[in-house]
């Protein structure tokens, strides 16, 4: 109630929830409020999960528990991050890179997936050459029927978040996966 009073007293109607976010360039394309892309209870039914830029256990312990349940049921988890964080679950593929290389690492996986699925690669990605590990991760993600891609706090607060989000959205479209 006190916070509402402060806003009323200052005649402000602007409240921003993106406290640590650095890249706002995608705001003109965003509609609605960012969300998980599915109800929380559906996380344990996923069979393929791509986690991008997240200290999952620290930032989202409830989601980590649900994803561990999914892994116990046979889900495959892939991670693209700049820290080799222990998720306390088996991870089928990892791409651990410098923070500045996070968008490029995700783009390589996107190109590998597009080539695997015979999808035309956008011109922005035309010169990207994925590695064998990128193809492995792409094939793993493509082999599932119920997948999701999650952008963690590190990705959301990354200086190139709009690029990460656009690439993740493209991957989700190719896979028919949910994005959150």
Walk through the language-model features, giving the residues of each.
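Catalytic alpha/large subunits of respiratory electron-transfer oxidoreductases
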Residues: 1-180
């Amino acid at each position: 109630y006190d916070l509402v009073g402060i806003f009323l007293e200052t005649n402000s109607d602007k409240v921003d929830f993106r406290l640590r976010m650095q890249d706002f360039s995608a705001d003109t394309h965003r509609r609605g409020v960012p969300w998980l892309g599915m109800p929380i209870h559906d996380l344990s039914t996923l069979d393929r999960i791509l986690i991008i830029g997240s200290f999952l256990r620290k930032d989202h312990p409830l989601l980590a528990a649900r994803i561990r349940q999914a892994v116990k049921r046979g889900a495959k988890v892939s991670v693209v991050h700049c820290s080799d964080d222990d998720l306390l679950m088996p991870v089928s593929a990892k791409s651990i890179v410098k923070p500045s290389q996070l968008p490029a690492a995700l783009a390589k996986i996107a190109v590998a997936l597009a080539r695997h699925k015979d999808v035309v690669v956008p011109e922005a990605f035309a010169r990207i050459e994925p590695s064998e590990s990128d193809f492995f991760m792409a094939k793993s993600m493509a082999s599932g029927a119920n997948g999701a891609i999650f952008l963690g706090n590190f990705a959301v607060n990354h200086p190139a978040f709009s690029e990460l989000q656009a690439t993740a959205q493209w991957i989700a479209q190719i896979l028919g996966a949910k994005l959150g």
